[in-house]
């Protein structure tokens, strides 16, 4: 089936929802301050409320029912609550064990079910009313490898072994190596602990170099950047581009100059622009309304909630941090395909390029 545009899906989604005079929204998430899950989902819920507040100012009639659905709870006791079956759309759950029951419930009452965060299972393949925002890591890896093959044609790949026993990037680098080998593209592997002269031999002086680490952690990144600085000092004309990981966005505040110097590209399904005027305004508004700052997490949960409200309830494809781009699953629901490369430009500045 041909991919539908994000705006078209959002528009049709909201036309169906707003066919009634009042849109009834349900939220079924752990909404408490007992643990990290509860605090994060409470912040997400608050972001939803801020978005709904803006939509009401635009003339939308929206009511919200929120139910606490903790990890040790029973979804059945929530689903029988007054108002649950009257919802037009429900945001939740957080925990995979509740999905089957909620999906069946929403199917029976013709309710749209937005699953905003990580779950396991293939429910979106079987339920036409599910909108799955979460992207499996395997899909992210495959999409990233495909994008590397397209965007960095002609580059000389250098994979750096960081000796990180805690790394979870082995499956990605293996997939990347297989893609290079299938296409007959030569790549070199070196080790961050190699002597400088040995490390240098892995690089090309005639072609642009694309450096990929087999670790996403900050200490290993720092070691490699130090190694590259030495390499560039001896070879000032050598061209180096680094392709990193989503986790690097957490380190960008302290590495912006290095990211720009090495033309860093990061795959992501969000971009938090701390200096953006609208982002700052929403963060300030959050503090005024709830008397505390958003948690220091990427992506910001409150802004994610706000973006979800504007997309699902207001058919807006403009986003502050968390873009959505859904594709219809044949015989099932909708899966989020939003994918960006965050590019730190050597000339300064950052751009988020959609693919």
Where are the predicted features?
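Bacterial Sec-dependent N-terminal signal peptides
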Residues: 1-25, 355
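Extracellular/periplasmic periplasmic-binding protein-like sensory domains
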Residues: 225-303
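Segments of small-molecule ligand-sensing domains
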Residues: 292-353
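Short, well-structured alpha-helical segments in soluble
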Residues: 72-88, 197-206
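Periplasmic-binding protein-like
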Residues: 26-27, 86-95, 113-117, 156-163, ...
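Extracytoplasmic ligand/sensor domains, especially the bilobed periplasmic-binding protein
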Residues: 91-176, 250-252
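Hinge/beta->alpha junction and helix N-cap segments in small-molecule ligand-binding domains
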Residues: 66-72, 117-119, 133-140, 161-172, ...
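N-terminal extracellular/periplasmic Venus flytrap/periplasmic-binding protein-like
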Residues: 20-81
């Amino acid at each position: 089936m041909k991919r539908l545009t994000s705006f078209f899906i959002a528009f049709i989604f909201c036309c169906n929802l707003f066919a009634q005079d009042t849109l009834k929204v349900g939220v079924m998430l752990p909404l408490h301050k007992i643990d990290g899950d509860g605090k994060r989902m409470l912040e997400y819920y608050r972001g939803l409320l801020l978005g709904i507040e803006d939509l009401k100012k635009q003339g939308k009639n929206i009511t919200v029912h929120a139910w606490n659905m903790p990890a040790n709870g029973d979804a059945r006791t929530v689903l029988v609550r007054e108002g649950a079956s009257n919802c037009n759309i429900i945001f939740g759950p957080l925990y995979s064990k509740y999905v089957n029951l909620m999906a069946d419930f929403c199917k029976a009452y013709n309710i749209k079910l937005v699953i905003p965060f990580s779950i396991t299972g293939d429910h979106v393949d079987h339920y036409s009313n599910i909108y799955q925002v979460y992207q499996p890591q395997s899909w992210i890896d495959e999409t990233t490898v495909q994008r590397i093959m397209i965007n960095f044609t002609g580059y000389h790949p250098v994979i750096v072994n960081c000796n990180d026993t805690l790394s979870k990037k082995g499956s990605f680098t293996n997939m990347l190596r297989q893609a290079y080998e299938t296409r007959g593209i030569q790549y070199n592997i070196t080790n961050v602990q190699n002597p400088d002269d040995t490390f240098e031999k892995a690089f090309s002086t005639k072609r642009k170099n694309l450096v990929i680490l087999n670790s996403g952690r900050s200490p290993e990144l720092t070691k490699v950047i130090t190694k590259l600085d030495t390499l560039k000092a001896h070879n000032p004309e050598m061209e180096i581009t680094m392709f990193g990981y989503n986790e690097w966005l957490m380190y960008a505040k302290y590495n912006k100059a290095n990211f720009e110097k090495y033309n860093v590209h990061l795959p992501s399904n969000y971009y938090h622009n701390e200096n953006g005027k609208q982002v700052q305004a929403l963060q300030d508004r959050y503090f005024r309304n709830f008397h505390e700052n958003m948690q220091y997490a990427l992506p910001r949960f409150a802004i994610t909630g706000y973006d979800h409200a504007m997309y699902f309830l207001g058919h807006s494809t403009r986003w502050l941090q968390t873009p959505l781009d859904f594709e219809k699953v044949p015989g099932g629901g909708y899966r989020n395909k939003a994918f960006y490369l965050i590019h730190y430009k050597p000339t300064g500045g950052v751009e988020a390029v959609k693919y």
